[in-house]
Amino acid sequence: MKINIALASTAAALVCLTSCMQEVLPTESVISDQIGQSASALEGMVNSIYTNMVGYKNEDGGIETISYGSMRVQLEHSTTMMVCPGYNGFNTMGAWTQGAVSASGSNRGIYPTYLYYGYIKTVNDVIGMIDLDNATDEMLVDLGICYAYRALYYMDLVQIMEYKKPLDSRYTYVDPKSDLSNLGVPIVTDKTTTQEASNNPRATVDEVYDLILSDLAEAEKYLAGYTRKDKVEPNLAVVYGLFARAYTNLASRTERAAKYTSKAEYWKLAGEYADKAIAQSGCTPLTEAQWTDPKTGFNNRNSQNSWMLATHIDPNNTTAATDGSFVYAMIMGTETTFSVYGWRVGRALDRAAYDRLSDNDWRKKSWLGPEFFYESKNQKAGEAYLIEKDANGNLINNKWATAGNNKSTEQGDWSDDPGKYQFSNSASWVRSRINTSYGFKAWPWLYVNRKFRPNEGNYNTYEVGGATDFPIMRVEEMYFLKAEAELNTTGVAAAKATLEGLIKTRNSSYSCAATTKKDVYEELMFQKGIEFWGEGINYFDNKRLETGCHRWYPGASVERAAHAIDMNRIHPGWTPGFNNAELNGNRAVYDFNNPYTAYSVYTTALRTNDEIASHYGEAIEVEGHKFFDTEKFE
C-alpha cells in the first residue's frame, strides 16, 4: 500500500522535495522513534530503500509511481539507438524521445530531481539514525549499503543535471541566465539542516564527486567481508564497480573540471577497479539461454548470473507491479496483454544499428525485424521470408491487406516456432497487433524489442507479469569499462582483446576489424550500446562522450518528425531543469537553472511525417553510417 514515511531527520532532505514523498510498500509505516528502539525497525528502514526504488510517488509534485529502472529507460529515450514507434503521443517517454523535457513548464522533465532526491532522503535518514559509537556490526553493514546507494544516486543525478552547452551550429539555443560551468547539483546529506537546504546552491561537479568518492570509501570499509543476502544489497564488488564508473566519468571530463584533472590517473584507476569488480563479483556474462528465456529473460535477478546489483518487486507488492504508466514491464513489454500503453507503444532499436549487428550475434534476437512481420507458414521454399508484391508494389500475399495490416488473428496461419521466437505468448498474437492499424506507421521496419520479458512469462496477469527485476549493474559493464580504460592507457591491442573476449560470448566468430583508437572506440561504444539497450547506461555514455543524437537518415525507422533528430555532439534534450518546487524552495538555484530549448527548433522545421514515411524501406549503407560523433574518441 502507499504510505508516508515521517522521520525526525527530514531536515536532512530538501523540504520541497520530501514533504509529500510516498513509497509503494507492502508493509506498515516506519516512524523515527522505532528506529532507535530495535534493530529490526532499522532493518525495515533499510528495506524501504529497495521498495522505494521500485515504486516512488509524489502526488503534490505530479509524479506518478515510477521505478529506478523506468527512470533509466526514460532517459535513454533521448539517445540514438532508442526509437519509440507506435501510439506514443501524450506520454512522457515520447517527450524524452523528442527532447520536450522542460522541468518548469510540464511534468516531463521533473522526474529526475524528484526521484533521486527522494532516494537520497531515504538513505540520509538511515545514516543519520545510526550512532557509530553504539553501532552493531549489522548497523555498520547498513551504513555501507546506504553509502553505496548514495554514491550511486549522486553519480546518476550529477550526470543528468550537469549542463553542457550545445555545439551544433545549425541551430539556435536558449542560453542559461548564469554561468553554469562545472556546476552539478545541490548536495544534501544526513547533516544538512532545513535552513541550509532552503539556500543550497548547486555544488560544483568536483564537489559532488568529492562526496561520491568519500561515500564509496565508507561503503568499501563497512562492506568488507560482508556476504549479502540478496542482489538488491550492494556488496564489495558493486562498490568496486561504482568506483570504476566514477573514475571513467572523471577521466572523461578533465577539461571541464577544477580539481579532478589527472586524466591518465583516472583511466588507470577505472581499469583497476573494473578488474577488481569482475574478480570480486564471481559473475559471468549472460548466456544466450539466460538472455532469451521467455520466462526469466531480463526479469529475474537470481537466474541472470551476470547481474551484480538489481531492484526487485516483492510478490506482495502488487501496487509497484501495476500502478500507473511507468511499470517497467509495461514500458518495455511487447508480448503482454496488460498495461496502460503496453504493446501499443513500441520500444525499438534504431534500424541502422539492427542492420549493422551481425546475424551471428544472438543478441539480435532481442528485436523483431521485418522478416518477423512478413513470415507465414505458406512462405516460398528456400526464401528467408515472404514478400510478394504486385506490379504496383502492393503486398498480395493472402495474409496481408494492401495497407500492410495483418488481417488474420488465427495462430494456425502463422509461423510460431517457439524455438525461434521464444514467446510465451504466440508470435501470431504479436503480429496481429503490432501493425499500422495500431499506430505503427513504420511497419514492418519496426525493430521492436522482446529483450525484457514479463515476470514468469506471464503476459496476461499484470500483478504477476509486472513484478520484474531490473539490473542496476551487470558484470558485462565492467568489461566495457576495462576495455575503454585500456584504450586510453595501454592502447588499442589490449582494448581490442578485452572487447573481443566479451563479444565472442555473443558471437563466436566476432573479430574487431578496427585498428585506430578512434575506430576501436566507435566499435566499443556500438557493442556497448547493443549490450545495454533499454537499461539506461547508453544515456550516460552518450552524454559523457558527447556522441550526439543521430536518429534521422533516409530509411530510418522513426515515425514522427519530432523524433527525427540529427544533433551533433550535445543534445539539449539530455539535460532537464530543476522542478518548480526546488526553484521556489531553494532560491540559490533559481538563477542557475538549466535552460530549455524547445524541440521544434531542431526537429519539425526540417522535415514532416510524410517525408519520413516516404523513405521507409530504403536501402541504407551501414558502412560509414554515423552512429556517434567521435571527437572525444581521439
Question: What does each model-identified segment do?
Answer:
Residues 20-74, 133, 342-345, 353-359, ...:
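Membrane-proximal, proline-rich intrinsically disordered regions
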Residues 87-164, 199, 203-208, 217-229, ...:
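Conserved, well-structured interaction surfaces
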Residues 31-33, 67-72, 161-181, 225-328, ...:
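Short, surface-exposed recognition loops and adjoining beta-strand edges that mediate ligand/DNA contacts
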Residues 3, 8, 15-43, 212, ...:
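Bacterial Sec-dependent N-terminal signal peptides
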Residues 55-56, 265, 279-463, 468, ...:
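Extended ligand-binding clefts on enzyme/binding-domain cores
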